[in-house]
Amino acid sequence: GPSGCGKTTLINLLSGLLKPTSGDIAFANYIYSELNEVEIDNLRFSNFGFIFQKLHLIGHLNAKQNIQIASNNKNSLNVENLIQTLGLKAIENKMVKNLSFGESQRVAVARCLVNSPKVIFADEPTSGLDDSNAKIVIDLILKQAKKTESSLIVSTHDQRIKNFFSDVLEM
């Protein structure tokens, strides 16, 4: 859908980052309104991965540390596998403030996928990427979702990626 139609708000509601003003949201037998903030945070950390429109990388950490900080197992082979798969090996020790946008985007994707989430929420994951990098990012997200049997919820106005998905809801 177009900018401003509520795509990000919908993702934030479904993931428990925002509380609905009416109605309720449930995931895996948990009703969000019955959970306290700590329980919602634990539900998110244990089940959800996020690729935010604004990447929210930690500027005083390097690329690898930004991925590791999200990992529930700091020595995980998954960190190394994602670094390799996403072509981040050459920049893993580079401070994120010195990365290009495409490199930063790939670090954010790796951070999202490091815990093999049950649900991947991707808010404009190809924003600012050229065709080649957009395809790499979408291919990786789809491959990881299939590998881990994750559900994938993508909000975008990028028409280039619409055909990658079997179910599309237009807003």
Per-segment meaning from a language model:
Residues S116:
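Conserved catalytic motifs of ABC-family nucleotide-binding domains
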Residues G23-I31:
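Conserved ABC transporter NBD signature motif
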Residues I31, S76-I91:
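Conserved ABC ATPase "signature" region
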Residues I120-D123:
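Catalytic Walker B motif of ABC-type/P-loop ATPase nucleotide-binding domains
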Residues S15:
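Helix-to-loop junction immediately C-terminal to a conserved catalytic motif
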Residues Y32-G49:
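ABC ATPase NBD coupling module
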Residues M95-Q105:
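Conserved ABC ATPase signature
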